[in-house]
């Protein structure tokens, strides 16, 4: 809505600590430490992994919590299932979507959540 605000930051101290953090971020190469092909987690690790992520938002005098959990390794097993279900949802459930650039949540919303819960081993909760 009109009053929606989003902010993401990494808070650091001033002076040398802040300068060091800024220099670190500006020189990072996020793909530089990526594993080479075949160096990722084992099949057993991918299939037996899981995750539970908690999001918290302060709104007026209350805190709203939402969580997402998955039944496989988030980097391999769950991601591939999310991409696949997003593609199927886009083709089957969102045929009338007007043109433009959307995030999966904005374009498919509840339809995608239902698919992910039904077919991809994900669980979404809001407290």
Where are the regions that the model predicts?
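C-terminal catalytic/substrate-binding lobe primarily of soluble NAD(P)-dependent oxidoreductases
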Residues: 1-127
């Amino acid at each position: 809505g009109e009053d929606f605000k989003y902010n993401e930051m990494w808070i650091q101290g001033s002076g040398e600590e802040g300068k060091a953090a800024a220099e670190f971020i500006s020189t990072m190469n996020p793909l530089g430490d990526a594993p080479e092909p075949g160096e990722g987690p084992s099949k057993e690790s991918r299939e037996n992994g899981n995750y539970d992520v908690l999001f918290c938002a302060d709104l007026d005098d209350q805190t709203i919590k939402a969580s997402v959990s998955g039944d496989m390794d988030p980097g391999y097993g769950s991601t591939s299932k999310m991409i696949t279900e997003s593609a199927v949802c886009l083709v089957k459930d969102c045929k009338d979507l007007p043109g433009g650039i959307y995030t999966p949540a904005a374009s498919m919303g509840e339809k995608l959540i239902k698919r992910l819960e039904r077919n991809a081993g994900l669980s979404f909760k809001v407290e």
